[in-house]
């Protein structure tokens, strides 16, 4: 299996990096099935969309296919949030998050030579494409709808701060590795909430391949170990965080957790 640390995410399609990350976490992840389904979608799109059409028309047709005929949509009533992130489940259920739906749409678009790009906007992943006339087209991957600068400004003010302003840098292309790390962060939080602690641990380990000494990720791994009753390793990880980030407001809570684990350890022994 390829190492996440050695893989050049920014030189490969976003979906390929996501598949590699999923493989690192789930031993049963059906990578070949996912690739087969992605290729099937590409073939369907090529049958329906002539590359002789103007770029804008090709993209309009692809969006109509993706959210219309193929039925992809934002996850609604999904029992587990993680199912909106695993690519095999997204392709099976046709429901997903902004990142997972965006990644699938990017795969098909890029195979059609449509220069669609990911953007990590402060509220969610969005997609952008620059048209031949220089106009920038922004797309919401949840539903394929166009996004105006006014709408993005409303999102910022409603979700970040009433005083937040929209800057051009907010619409810059994101590195794939940045998108993958955000996906894994969300996946880890979802798995912890769903009490799928073994998978959450493997997700944390995957994130640590990008930055092995990240105190915040080591803290999260320690909290997961504590849930798995692996007290000794949990103590090591949590203590590392407190040593590295003594001024962090959450350090007091972590110290209390360390004391609880240490006390439990003494009582048991």
From Swiss-Prot:
Domain of life: Bacteria
A Pfam short name: Transglut_core2
PANTHER family in the record: F-BOX ONLY PROTEIN 21, SI:DKEY-261L7.2
Family per record: Belongs to the UPF0162 family.
Protein's name in the database: UPF0162 protein YchA
Gene: ychA
């Amino acid at each position: 299996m390829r190492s996440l640390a050695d893989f050049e995410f920014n030189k490969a399609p976003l979906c390929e990096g996501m598949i590699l990350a999923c493989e690192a976490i789930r031993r049963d992840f059906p990578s070949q099935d996912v690739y087969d389904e992605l290729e099937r979608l590409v073939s369907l799109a090529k049958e329906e969309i002539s590359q002789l059409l103007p770029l804008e028309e090709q993209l309009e047709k692809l969006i109509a296919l993706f959210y219309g005929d193929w039925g992809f949509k934002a996850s609604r009533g999904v029992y587990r949030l993680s199912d909106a992130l695993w690519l095999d489940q997204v392709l099976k259920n046709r429901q997903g998050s902004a990142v997972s739906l965006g990644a699938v749409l990017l795969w098909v678009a890029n195979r059609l030579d449509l220069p669609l790009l990911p953007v990590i906007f402060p509220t969610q992943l969005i997609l952008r494409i620059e048209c031949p006339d220089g106009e920038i087209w922004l797309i919401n991957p949840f539903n394929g709808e166009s996004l105006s600068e006014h709408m993005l400004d409303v999102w910022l003010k409603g979700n970040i701060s009433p005083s937040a302003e929209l800057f051009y840098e907010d619409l810059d292309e994101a590195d794939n590795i940045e998108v993958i790390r955000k996906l894994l962060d969300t996946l880890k939080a979802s798995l912890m909430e769903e009490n799928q602690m073994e998978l959450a641990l493997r997700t944390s380990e995957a994130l640590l391949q990008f930055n092995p000494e990240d105190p915040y990720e080591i803290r999260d791994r320690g909290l997961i170990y504590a849930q798995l009753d692996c007290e000794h390793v949990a103590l090591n990880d949590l203590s590392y965080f407190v040593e590295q980030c003594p001024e962090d407001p959450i350090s007091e809570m972590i110290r209390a957790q360390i004391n609880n684990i240490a006390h439990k350890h003494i009582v048991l022994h």
